[in-house]
Amino acid sequence: MKIQTAPLLLALTVMPLGAVFACDAPVAPPSPDGGSATLEEMIAAQGEVKAFQAANAEYLECVDNQMSAEQASIDEGDESAKERYALAAADYNAAVSREEQVAADFNSAIKAYKAANPD
């Protein structure tokens, strides 16, 4: 099977940068009910939070790279890159807020767990 490279190269050169940077935001894990969760459930939830934080760090790096590329396009006079940059910045800020919320929810679950299990 012979692959035709010319159409593929053309498609890649006219693709917007957002399509090149396929940054996939991770799904936030559910927060456990600390008041009724077992220790094992809390430990599992902690692992999910840590995995989410690691995946979110990769996502933020991807979006940051996208923003850098858009800034370079802006510097070269590409006016349409301003909108793409703003969208990427909004995505970045939303991801930071989402991670902060996941951490706050898990901290609340830990407090509830400790209150329900004072030993």
Task: Give the role of each language-model region.
Residues 2-22:
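Classic N-terminal secretory signal peptides
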Residues 16, 32-33, 75:
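Intrinsically disordered, low-complexity segments enriched in small/polar residues
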Residues 66-67, 71-119:
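Compact alpha-helical subdomains of small soluble proteins
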Residues 20-68:
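Immediate post-signal-peptide N-terminus of mature secreted/exported proteins
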Residues 4, 39-42, 74-81:
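Short, structured coil/loop segments at alpha-helix boundaries
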Residues 16-17, 56, 100:
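Processing junctions and N-termini across compartments
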